[in-house]
Amino acid sequence: MAIWVDADACPNVIKEILFRAAERVQMPLTLVANQSLRIPPSKFIRSMRVPAGFDVADNEIVRLCNPEDLVITADIPLAAEVLEKGAAALNPRGERYSPSTIRQILTMRDFMDTLRASGVQTGGPDTLSQRDRQQFAAELDKWLLEVKRRTA
């Protein structure tokens, strides 16, 4: 089991939470991005640089992740693809995607894209709050505990 991060847009504070968790539980953590990333020295943490381009990092994560891995992403289509492979998906705000909710979330995303394409100003997401960070850490710990129980 491993944790994969769609790292180009992942907030630094979330990366820091992931770095500490990977060290604490000694689990492989890979940050995938199309730019160089700073990571702490660790035998559990690595970065993977991919060429720039549309969905290149996403496609690499889908290719490399395995069932029961965890993928950290705010990219809803990527979350849908890794769920189909049997991996778990968690966004940086602490929302865990599930097979039962991902279709509805994809539909809402597509609807918002249509609105934006027609000129409607929809605004972006709120800045990451302390509550979001706490929710992310709690959901990450919950997943790590599930993994520990399955492998015990």
From Swiss-Prot:
It comes from the Bacteria. It holds the Pfam family DUF188. Transmembrane segments: none annotated. CDD domains: PIN_YqxD-like. InterPro entries: UPF0178. Belongs to the UPF0178 family. HAMAP family: UPF0178 (MF_00489). This is UPF0178 protein Ent638_0858. It comes from Enterobacter sp. (strain 638).
